[in-house]
């Protein structure tokens, strides 16, 4: 689910935190990608360039086709991806998972009705809702990535949290996912639409964590409370409080405890046994592997291994797989080129640091104006007559 309404709230109130770019803008960047999100996107694909998307036994292969060609495209554009796979979901997520199971049951009933009625559009719609990423899909994807020479990380818990940890440790530039809660976990950069197909022509949308905090006039702790009010995977939200009201409450009271002390109980009903404090701690201290100790290596692909894995029962074209392997090799050789800014260490900015920089800039500007005034308009000066 991510965070309900967060993307629009940022677009409305902190538009400076969002930048749209072409994929090539991220040349030379290392990016942590939410693998489960990618696999889901690939599994719901009906076709990919006219190729078969199933084995001879009818098992889906669209996740492998998507992973193979989309990863090649990223590397072609000079991006070095590392895929992060989900581990065991936190206990707090059980409520959200139960809701998903209910929606799945409803989709199964709706699919049966659509099938009985011969409703092709309905059949496609509800089939998509029944798609889920299994352990087998993830296992196959990891095997493929190993053969491609692309690293992956097994997160102990939530992939978005692990991606954010890699970003904060300076191992990668950004998190690539469609789930906005990567920002709640503290990822300083979030990329959306990075793994979308080229045919969709969607520019990559980059969110800056520091700029959104500045634009919303809140700090990181207050941002977490805002996300809980908006609605997250780990606890219920207060019914009736939408995005606009949520940011107003945070700006006025700064935390959920003070909001609850001042909330109009005749208008809003707080969920019984609301475990927002546990959800908050999960965002502050998520279960992640030590990012500092994770060694990311991009190595040469195993062409023969790829042919053996993807062709045969999985029915991939050997010619296309070999062409893909050659592209991987070419991109590996081109990785000696680096971004100019990679030679400089960028210190993480904070709202306080940003405000201090603004004040310094304003003072410098004022000082320069004063000097200019003295030079051009002082006694005995031969300044220009104002036009």
UniProtKB/Swiss-Prot annotation:
Residue sites binding Mg(2+) 2 per the record: 179, 181, 233
Record carries keyword RNA-binding: no
Cofactor note: Binds 2 magnesium ions per subunit. They probably participate in the reaction catalyzed by the enzyme. May bind an additional third magnesium ion after substrate binding.
UniProt-annotated binding residues for Mg(2+) 1: 34, 86, 158, 160
UniProt PTM: Phosphorylated. Phosphorylation upon DNA damage induces relocalization to the nuclear plasma.
Cellular localisation: Nucleus, Nucleolus; Nucleus, Nucleoplasm; Mitochondrion
InterPro entries: 5-3_exonuclease_C_sf, Flap_endonuc, HhH2, PIN-like_dom_sf, XPG-I_dom, XPG/Rad2, XPG_CS, XPG_DNA_repair_N
EC supergroup of this enzyme: hydrolase
Cofactor: Mg(2+)
Interaction with PCNA: region residues: 336-344
Ranges for region N-domain: 1-104
Keywords of the record: DNA damage, DNA repair, DNA replication, Endonuclease, Exonuclease, Hydrolase, Magnesium, Metal-binding, Mitochondrion, Nuclease, Nucleus, Phosphoprotein
One GO CC term, this protein: nucleoplasm
Biological processes, Gene Ontology terms: base-excision repair; DNA replication, removal of RNA primer
Stretch list, region I-domain: 122-253
Enzyme Commission number(s) from the entry: 3.1.-.-
Binding residues for DNA: 47, 70, 158, 231, 233
GO molecular function list: 5'-3' exonuclease activity; 5'-flap endonuclease activity; DNA binding; magnesium ion binding; manganese ion binding; RNA-DNA hybrid ribonuclease activity
Stored PROSITE patterns: XPG_1, XPG_2
Region described as Disordered: 346-387
Family under the similarity heading: Belongs to the XPG/RAD2 endonuclease family. FEN1 subfamily.
Described purpose of this protein according to its UniProt entry: Structure-specific nuclease with 5'-flap endonuclease and 5'-3' exonuclease activities involved in DNA replication and repair. During DNA replication, cleaves the 5'-overhanging flap structure that is generated by displacement synthesis when DNA polymerase encounters the 5'-end of a downstream Okazaki fragment. It enters the flap from the 5'-end and then tracks to cleave the flap base, leaving a nick for ligation. Also involved in the long patch base excision repair (LP-BER) pathway, by cleaving within the apurinic/apyrimidinic (AP) site-terminated flap.
Official protein name in the record: Flap endonuclease 1
Organism: Drosophila erecta
Lineage: Eukaryota, Metazoa, Ecdysozoa, Arthropoda, Hexapoda
């Amino acid at each position: 689910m991510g965070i309900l309404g967060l993307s629009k709230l940022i677009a409305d109130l902190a538009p400076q935190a969002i930048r749209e770019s072409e994929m090539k803008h991220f040349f030379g960047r290392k990016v942590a990608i939410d693998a489960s999100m990618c696999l889901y996107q690939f599994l719901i694909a009906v076709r990919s360039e006219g190729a078969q998307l199933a084995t001879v036994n009818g098992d889906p292969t669209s996740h492998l086709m998507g992973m193979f060609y989309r990863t090649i495209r990223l590397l072609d554009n000079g991006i070095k991806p590392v895929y992060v796979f989900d581990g065991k979901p936190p206990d707090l997520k059980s409520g959200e998972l139960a809701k998903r199971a209910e929606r799945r049951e409803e989709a199964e009933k709706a699919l049966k009705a659509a099938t009985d009625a011969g409703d092709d559009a309905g059949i496609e719609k509800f089939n998509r809702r029944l798609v889920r990423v299994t352990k087998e899909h993830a296992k196959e994807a990891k095997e493929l990535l190993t053969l491609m020479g692309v690293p992956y990380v097994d997160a102990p818990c939530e992939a978005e949290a692990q991606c954010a940890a890699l970003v904060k440790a300076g191992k990668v530039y950004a998190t690539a996912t469609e789930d906005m809660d990567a920002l709640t976990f503290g990822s300083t950069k979030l990329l959306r639409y990075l793994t979308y197909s080229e045919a969709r022509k969607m520019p990559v949308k980059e969110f800056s964590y520091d700029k959104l905090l500045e634009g919303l006039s809140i700090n990181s702790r207050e941002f977490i409370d805002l996300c809980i009010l908006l609605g997250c995977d780990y606890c219920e939200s207060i019914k009736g409080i939408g995005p606009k009201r949520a940011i107003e409450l945070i700006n006025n009271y700064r935390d959920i405890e003070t909001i609850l002390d001042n909330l109009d109980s005749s208008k809003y009903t707080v969920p019984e046994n609301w475990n927002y404090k546990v959800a908050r701690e999960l965002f502050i201290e998520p279960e992640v592997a030590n990012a500092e100790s994770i060694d990311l290596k991009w190595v040469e692909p195993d062409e023969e291994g790829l042919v053996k894995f993807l062709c045969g029962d999985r029915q991939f074209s050997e010619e296309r797989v070999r062409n893909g392997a050659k592209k991987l090799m070419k991109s590996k050789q081109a990785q000696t080129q680096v971004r100019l800014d990679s030679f400089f260490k960028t210190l993480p900015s904070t709202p306080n640091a940003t405000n201090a920089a603004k004040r310094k800039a304003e003072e410098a500007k004022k000082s320069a104006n004063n000097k200019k005034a003295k030079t051009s308009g002082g006694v005995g000066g031969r300044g220009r007559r104002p036009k």
